[in-house]
Amino acid sequence: MVQIQFHQGEPLGHKKEKPPPVSPPSPPPIRRVTVITKDEDTLRSVQHFLWMVRLYGTVVFQTSATIATTILFMLIPWRVTTPYLRDTLPFWSTLLPCALRCHAYWLERQRRPGTLMLVMVYTTLTTISVSTIGLCFDRTVVIQAYVLSSMLCVWCTGLAWLMAWNMQRRLAILCLLSFMLPILWLFIAVQSWEPYQRIILALTVSFIYGLKIVLIRDTLTVLYRSPSNCYTDGDLLRTAMLLYMDQVIMFLLVVVPLTAPIWYPNYAGALGRTAHWLFHK
């Protein structure tokens, strides 16, 4: 007798599928934590300090070359006597350093390294522009401008160091800088000056204030420099050009209020006549 067996639970002719193979769970990814030892931290601090010494040494060399050339121009007995040229030459001399500062900032944004030849070109062009100030004004005015601009640069550098050192002091300094410009504007507004004098001084103070903020930012960039940049010579020269141009433009802006008694009275009537001719033609 033939026995016929029926498979319960499955239709006839259907092949039973095998379950997919189950792979074992993969272990979690291993996180590699770079542990910086005390010796490595000390080595990086020393490397950063030496890099900053070289940086500010380069800036001091550029500034010394500019000051020495300006003193030589001041010793020349000849002076610019044409009123218009004497009073406007410092303004035209400011345009070239501002253009060079923009180019140095562009190099900083593009992460392009600076070269020794570029530093020499920057120093030469800027020195020629600044030295013309010595042919336009008295020695006392130039010396006062150098002293005052140097004090402002040292003050901005000190604020940047304090901001990098302590978080609470950083917030206090930011609050101080926020209220400083309105206070200076209020001081200018209450003075018994002519309207054009107030406008020019307010614009000059605004430019100096903005340049102080830029100088603080550049100094903080130097203090918070990442070790991944390897402290190369190209980065050093590029940063030195930025700091040098900040100091030069600060000096040129400080010249404006110091020379106010010379050129404010001369051009007050001319500005008034020009405005009257433009608006009442």
Curated annotation (Swiss-Prot):
Q: Where is this region: Disordered?
A: 1-30
Disulfides per UniProt: none
Keyword vocabulary terms for this entry: Host membrane, Membrane, Transmembrane, Transmembrane helix
Q: A single Pfam family, by name?
A: Bax1-I
Q: Where in the cell is it found?
A: Host membrane
What are the TM regions of this chain, as residue ranges?
Answer: 58-78, 88-107, 117-137, 145-165, 171-191, 196-216, 248-268
Q: What is its main location?
A: host cell
Which membrane topology term applies here? Multi-pass membrane protein
Q: List all Pro residues biased stretches.
A: 20-30
GO cellular component, as recorded = host cell membrane; membrane
Q: Which superkingdom heads the taxonomic lineage of this protein's source?
A: Viruses
Task: Give the family from UniProt.
Answer: Belongs to the cytomegalovirus US12 family.
Q: What is this protein called?
A: Uncharacterized protein US12
Gene encoding this chain?
A: US12
